[in-house]
Every structure is written in C-alpha cells, then in structure tokens.
Regions:
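A short, well-ordered alpha-helix in the C-terminal region of glycosyltransferases
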Residues: 288, 295-310, 316-322
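N-terminal pre-catalytic "stem/leader" segment of glycosyltransferase-like enzymes
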Residues: 1-57
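Carbohydrate-associated surface elements
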Residues: 123, 141
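Active-site proximal beta-strand in glycosyltransferases
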Residues: 58, 74-91
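Conserved acidic donor-binding segment of nucleotide-sugar-dependent glycosyltransferases
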Residues: 269-280, 288-294
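Nucleotide-sugar-dependent
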Residues: 171, 215, 219-222, 227-250, ...
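Membrane-proximal helix-turn-helix segments that form the acceptor-binding/catalytic region
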Residues: 46-53, 68, 72-76, 88, ...
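Conserved catalytic-core segment of nucleotide-activated headgroup transferases in glycan assembly
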Residues: 10-25, 143-147, 154-223
Length: 331
C-alpha cells in the first residue's frame, strides 16, 4: 500500500498529532508512506496532480480544496481519505456569525468526494453522516511513552496554572484575565504559565511566558500543577477535540475546563478535574486545587488513566491502519 499524506505544516499541532506520529507505526506494518505539505505554487500543483495516480490512497488532513481542484483530485486520485479535527464548516469563535455558506459548501463537497472520512470527535462525525456514511471517529491522541506522569514529589514554592496552545486560541484564556487577577490577590505563591507564541500580561499574578517548542512541550506540561482549558459555547468549540486536556492528563495534571463539547467527555467533573461555567466557578475550582496538592495528584493520576484508556497513539494507530486497509479493499 502506497499512501500520500498531505499536511498543513510540520509544526502544526493537527499535523503532528493526527498524521506524523502515526507514520512509524504505518511503516512498520507495510505502508509505504510519503508526507508532504499541500502544494502552493503552479509548479507544485502540476507535479502534485501528475504524481497522484502512483498512490493507492491520498490522505488529506483538514484542508478543503475548491471545486476545480477537487474535481482534478477526484479524477487523479485512486482513493481519498479526509481527516479533520475542527469545525471547519463554521467560522471560528471570534466571528459574529458562526454560519458560513461558503465554508459549509466547500466542506460538503470535500466530504462527498472522499472515500472515507476520519473525524476527531462525535460532533464532527455527525456533520459528515448526512452526506457520507463512511466515517469513523479517531480522537486526537498522545504517545504514552513520550508523555510520562510528572513527579509530584519535586519540591516547589509556587503553584503553576498552565495553558498550552497557539495564537488562534489564546483569546479564550485572555478572557479570564479578571479571574487571574483575583487569584493572584488571594494566592501570592501562584503563577500563570503560558506556552504559546503570543502572550498577555496580568498585574496581580506573575505570568511566565514560554515560547512553544516541540521538543520541550512535555517538559513544560510536567511543570504545570493545574491545566486550564476555557472555551465558549459555540459551533466552533463543539468541534474542538480536546488536545490540551489530553496533553494535561497525559502528564498527570488535574484540569479545569469549560464543559463544552468533548471537554465533557474528557474531564469527569470531580474525578479528573472540574467543570467551570461562570467566573465564580472558575475562581472557586482553581482555588480548591491550589489549596489541595493531594487532590491535584489524585485527579491527575485518574486523568492519566482515562487517557491511557483510548487517547494514545498505541491505541489509535491500529485503528487508522485498519481504516486504510478497508479503504484499499473496497476498490
């Protein structure tokens, strides 16, 4: 089996966690893999469409082609597998109106043209089913060998609230600015650590700004004491696949999150972390964890057990391989 995997970037989270980390497993099971960035220039596109027939499967991660390119893709590709992990059929949370007919139309066309679709969660799967019944959920996962439980016994004089992500999501965290100020007033030994490529400041709580680096992200996560994942309740957030939470729980952190979409499945309220809907709940739940290190450890260990139950490369890679084999067998 020869498979071409198209990704949006080598450092893009979806590329790393939904494609690149599966390549070694696929290769070890006989799949001849080629990974490439989406073509941009005219020359790259000509070469891309020229090469397509040599592959048994073309695996597209997230990006939707416009109608002319999609027609060419369907003519030249033997089999198409489309993978996505966001509400790409809607506008993001910053938009006044989440509905976009252009996005919806392009998404529908992409789904119709695909032989199989892999969705990152059940909400996304349900967007596919009316158009294409050949769809399964594979959650965004982590490598359980790379993500090890943090050392709870390391002495620390500060409690670290942590958030990891990219510039497109930090606005969710920044909206909690007043909460962080109140937390800082109550707990002088508390800090907020942001691992990202952009940052913001607070006056009453120390903000530790750490530039994200792929080879340091696990160590950064292990330095957190409490993981945060705020969201808003909208169609864009419903499509999120909870990678932050999976990362937090993978290293044994308790999580405080907005109970929206997949967050409700990943965080068991009162067991692996807390749900927080209002500013008062956010402040209260964070405070409870700041004051109770034993509760942090208990919830963190329980969260890791949950992740090991189905959100690892070790459990998801065989499922991806099985899908590729089934797609091969159909044609």
């Amino acid at each position: 089996m020869k498979a071409l995997f198209l990704i949006q970037g080598w450092e893009v989270a979806a590329s790393r966690y939904r494609v690149l980390q599966y390549i070694p497993y696929l290769k070890s099971h006989g799949v001849e893999t080629t990974v490439s960035l989406y073509p941009r220039s005219i020359k790259e596109n000509i070469q891309f469409f020229s090469d397509l027939p040599q592959y048994d499967i073309v695996f597209l991660q997230r990006k939707r082609f416009n109608q002319p390119r999609l027609r060419w893709l369907r003519r030249r590709a033997r089999r198409i597998v489309y993978d996505f992990d966001d509400s790409v059929m809607y506008r993001n949370s910053k938009a006044k109106d989440p509905v976009s007919q252009t996005r919806k139309r392009r998404f529908t066309q992409m789904i119709k043209a695909s032989d199989f679709v892999i969705a990152g969660n059940e909400f996304l799967r349900d967007q596919v089913l009316p158009v294409n019944p050949n769809v399964e959920v594979i959650p965004t996962s982590i490598d359980q060998e790379r993500y090890q439980t943090k050392d709870y016994l390391v002495p620390k004089d500060r409690v670290t609230l942590g958030w990891i992500g990219d510039h497109g999501s930090i606005h969710y965290l920044e909206k909690m600015h007043p909460i962080f100020e109140r937390i800082g007033e109550r707990y002088s030994h508390c800090e907020l650590k942001i691992v990202c490529d952009i940052f913001f400041d607070c006056e009453k709580i120390q903000v530790v700004k750490k530039q994200w680096k792929s080879d340091e992200e696990v160590e950064d996560l292990q330095g957190f004491d409490i993981g945060l994942m705020p969201l808003v309740d909208d169609p864009w957030s419903w499509g999120k696949c909870g990678l932050k939470i999976v990362q937090y729980q993978g290293v044994g952190l308790p999580v405080v999150c907005t109970p929206v979409g997949v967050n409700r499945d990943l965080v068991v309220d009162g067991a692996t972390g807390f749900w927080a809907r209002t500013p008062e709940e956010w402040e209260g739940k964070i405070s409870e964890l700041i004051e109770n290190p034993l509760l942090r450890e208990r919830m963190g260990r329980e969260g890791r057990r949950k992740v090991l139950g189905g959100y690892t490369v070790q459990s998801c890679a065989p499922r991806l391989f099985s899908i590729l084999k089934r797609v091969m067998d159909k044609k």
